[in-house]
């Protein structure tokens, strides 16, 4: 079974550390071909790249996948992810984080991936963002939720 995990950045943080641990653990299970796709690591938080660098073929970088809303790069990321998913033909695409979750689920649907999973590590929207970004994320999450086959939450508070 071929599984692709997708996260926006490999920075030091809970969602990223959880994703890397899951990918490395699943990669050792017989019958699973597990890989990770991420945007470029930037930010003062620090990087988790060293944890995956020693695993050949594990990480694919997608420079168009960036954290801020950027219509041109976001559309480019969807196109590149769609092409990647069509080429690799995964059985499962498992997305993590708000931006990768929305763009990755859309690309997986466009590529005909049969199982699309999204883990909610924390809110993608809320009072911590401006009203425009907040509204955009809410609409995008509602839309992506329509073709997400499974949701995983890391805490019961995220289920709502």
PLM regions and their residue ranges:
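Nucleotide-sugar donor phosphate/pyrophosphate-binding loop at the beta->alpha transition
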Residues: 72-79, 114-117, 124-147
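Glycine-rich phosphate-binding loop signature in dinucleotide/nucleotide-binding domains
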Residues: 84-91
